[in-house]
Amino acid sequence: MNELSSYLRRTLCEAWRNGYGEEARRAAIVAPLLTLVGFAAAWFFPQLTDHVMGVLEQAIDSAGLSSTAETKDMAAAIFANNLTAAFSAILWGLVPFAYLAAFPLGFNFFLIGALGAYYVRSGSSLGVYLVGILPHGIFELPALVLFCAAGLYLCSRVTARVRGDKEVRILRTLSEVSTLFLYVILPLLAAAALMETYVTPRLLAMVL
């Protein structure tokens, strides 16, 4: 156990120094700003939210996240859906120059803000909306920031290598990102899925 802890600390600290820390800080700063932009956009252009809600409902149904699903199936579906999103965002980092992981970061936090405006305009309180997202969001939102930052970090390293930086070791970077995924992001997503399935609905039932 001590050896594992030492390995994790050493690997994650190295990734942080090599640029992951910068990407994570940047993502953490941009995320709340995008949420505010999403809220403002949906507040002043409500037709935008109506379209987004239609797309979101279709995505929920296709992912097996409908309210009619069994509880255990719901937890598994939420975890699988978030796991796929995280894995995809990180893999996109293998494409140099594009920084594709910025898209899920921007879209998801913009959507959180837009949905907040939608519920407030529909007559619900912002407090009820926060009760619906914060219990699992305290795990899921940091995971979202971390895995998008991992994709951006991987892209920056691949880009540097393509540009001729011989000091960048892609295999080492992949090892860093894999360690982060397995020992930090994965547990956060698992906790988020359990909270969203078993805790959030009960809290919502208390305030609705």
Regions of interest found by a model, annotated:
Residues 134-151, 155-157:
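A structural-propensity feature for long, helix-poor, extended segments
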Residues 149-208:
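Terminal transmembrane helical module of multi-pass membrane proteins
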Residues 43, 47, 93-117:
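Transmembrane alpha-helix/helix-exit interface in multi-pass inner-membrane proteins
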Residues 49-69, 111-132:
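Membrane-interface interhelical connector segments
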Residues 8-25, 89, 166-174:
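Cytosolic juxtamembrane amphipathic/interface segments immediately preceding
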Residues 64-92:
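Interfacial helix-start motif at the membrane-water boundary
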Residues 18-53:
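N-terminal signal-anchor transmembrane alpha helix
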Residues 119-137, 193-208:
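Interfacial helix-loop-helix junctions of multi-pass membrane proteins
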